[in-house]
Amino acid sequence: MADIEIKENEIPGVITNCVSDSISSIFKKIFGVVPEYDGDDNSKNIGDGVVGIISFVGDASWILMLAFPKDSAEKLAEKFCGFKVPYDNPDMGDVIGELANVMAGDIVARMGVQGVKVAMSLPTVLRGQNVEPFMAKGIPDKKMHYTVMGKDVMIKIVVGNSNEMMGATPGA
């Protein structure tokens, strides 16, 4: 078992590094380009968009949100599928869920190489305005912003101890 220390307002580097490496690798394979990292900004929201959420438990308990504003979701879904997927179509949820699932599987593998054992949940997909989970005060979180094919993508990571995380059980 790896010793992952959770400090107040700080995401462990092994998590952020694995997430950053994963989005670069997976999006390069799927979309043909490495996402451009635009920095961290916890005050920036996605507006009207769709979000794929995966929880991880094990040596570290945390949540990953892969968020796409409406126009980003439509453009990237079309590239991923090879045909247009309307934003309001239920298939959009399947596309975003699959992207989150593929990325999460890659993250689990990368963390395993680092000696960190985690299991992932099935994806939950939500659509709406500035969709984010409510978490207890003091739980570290981080929003990482990227540009892919000229479109915004946001990743939010929320890390905590197992007893602090809501919905942290895989399959929950």
Please report, for each region that a protein language model flagged, where it lies by residue.
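N-terminal auxiliary interaction/assembly segments of multi-subunit proteins
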Residues: 1-172
